[in-house]
């Protein structure tokens, strides 16, 4: 099971990097960040496919999408100076709570 969570962590990080590079690529006008988008998302989906050999789909996908959303929001705030209001913070806390509850066994 631990190896599944390692694969899932790599998938989440890769997906978040890919999302950040989507913004940097300026609509795929810049080739280097565009290439990183393709590489990061390819790695993310490959790692997610490996995760599914160890963790059920319902748990894997919910964790991947929830934690990926939170991480992408953090990247947006930290590196792209995007603002997050109170509703956004509450949403992030709810996502984190949901992921924790799903993984609590």
UniProtKB/Swiss-Prot annotation:
- Main subcellular localization, coarse class? membrane
| Protein's recorded name | Multidrug resistance protein EbrA
Select a single GO molecular function from the record's annotations and give it: transmembrane transporter activity
Pfam families linked to this entry: Multi_Drug_Res (PF00893)
Family, according to the entry, reads as follows: Belongs to the drug/metabolite transporter (DMT) superfamily. Small multidrug resistance (SMR) (TC 2.A.7.1) family. EbrA/EbrB subfamily.
State the protein's purpose: Part of a multidrug efflux pump. Confers resistance to cationic lipophilic dyes such as ethidium bromide, acriflavine, pyronine Y and safranin O. The efflux is probably coupled to an influx of protons.
The subcellular localization recorded is:
Cell membrane
Lineage start: Bacteria, Bacillati, Bacillota, Bacilli, Bacillales
* Transmembrane region(s): 2-22, 35-55, 57-77, 84-104
Gene3D superfamilies, per the entry: 1.10.3730.20
The family database entries (InterPro entries) matched by this protein are listed as: Small_drug/metabolite_transptr, Small_multidrug_res
Q: According to its record, what are the GO cellular component terms?
A: plasma membrane
State whether keyword Cell division applies: no
* Secreted is among the record's keywords: no
The gene name on file is ebrA
Q: How does it assemble?
A: The efflux pump is composed of EbrA and EbrB.
Q: Which UniProt keywords apply?
A: Cell membrane, Membrane, Transmembrane, Transmembrane helix, Transport
The protein's topology relative to the membrane is: Multi-pass membrane protein
